[in-house]
Amino acid sequence: MNNFVLFLGLLSTSFALQVLADDADKVDKNELNRLFNINYDGLVYSGYLKANTEGTAQFHYMFYPAPEDPLKKPVILWLNGGPGCSSLQGAFNENGPFVFKAGTSEFEMNQYSWTNFANMLYIESPITVGFSYGPQGEQSDESTAKYNINALVDFFNRFTEFKKLPFFISGESYAGIYIPTLANEIIDYNAGKAADNRINLQGLAIGNGCTDPTECTDEADPFQIHVYKFYGRHNFISQELYEKILAVQNECYGVKDGKCKELADSVEVEVSGTEEDNIKFNPYNIYGYCFTYTPEGSRMSQKFGGMRSLNEDTDIPPCADVQGLYHHLRSAEVRTLLKIRTESAKWAVCSRTLGQYNVNPKGSYYLYPKILKNQIRILKFSGDVDAVVPLTGTMFWVDKLQKELQLATLKPWRPWFVPPKRDVDPDQNAGYVMDMDGLTLLTIRNAGHMVPLDKREESEVFMKKFLNDEFFP
């Protein structure tokens, strides 16, 4: 009897994967291995998802089913931020099965890939980002959420075997807006539907994500108090300037001129030097390397002191390691491999054709009570050397949220660890963690804005624990 059940299970899995293998979006494995000079035996899909009912908005996606037992593992949607930056950064630089060697166009296998424990879906969002296309015009946090839910529904309608599996959304940076707004759409979508027709959303894992109105909104941009506090605490600005900033922090919020602008400009100069100095400082990892790669037709931001302007005329964030992305994703052969349509523009890491993007001044903070009420677990992870969406801001709003919602502390602030490289050594400190009712705050020591890039092993450890709903030690 047990052998018969086992046989049926294997038959069921084989049938499901055979259905997938017939899908038109399946990437040619031999050609992928040839072009990328790798040896990957898993399935890869690349194509387009309908992001509106008319089908005029088409979002490019890549999907990596887990190579082993995919139907026994959860599905994770990964979104990068911007707004307007491609999620293929996540696939090829951070947590995909093969990633670029630092500063090169060469792939290497990622032993800490999230495909070890999950089925990974990457969607380029919103319109004009990466290979995605559609009607151009004003976009907003709200319209992006609508597009994303439509694309997600289309994905599960096509990959029906995965719809019943536990579903999680993860990402970083401005995905701190994308993820809660999409979760809100999923909650509304699921309302009144039978269990078989719902999206099985279980949790959100947001890295260095914009959340509070005081972080990434237009109102917060002129005087970035959380960034300035981060620089002050890390001795990147003088004590004299830091004290001046603290003295006026409340009156300078949202102020673009006068003494507030003078102080903001002083931070820029003390941290990065003047434009004449041409000092390249990496705000995404304050102790990290600053790469410079600007392909033809692209521009790199020269704003190094904090989060780049949302409407800045650039498609490459400062110091970003993008050589491999541009080398491959602008190749005609790779476009053919990934089944990229002629409607898709030349790929860029961040879109300069996004158009007018309207940022919600409320951020995504206002959605957290609804999400937690619907028993969707939240992991807020933060690299502690990121100056773009720094830990100072995250701890500010997490503390505020806990007090407002009276979230019980389940386990207090404490260190967490990863295994040592040598058996003779002790477990290694990976950061700090605090568990509240429905919400976990986790820091990653010496990681920047892109945690899975900077700390791959640590990312695998904490993500597996979150998926399994396990406490950290």
Spans of model-derived segments:
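Terminal and linker regions of secretory-pathway proteins
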Residues: 2-473
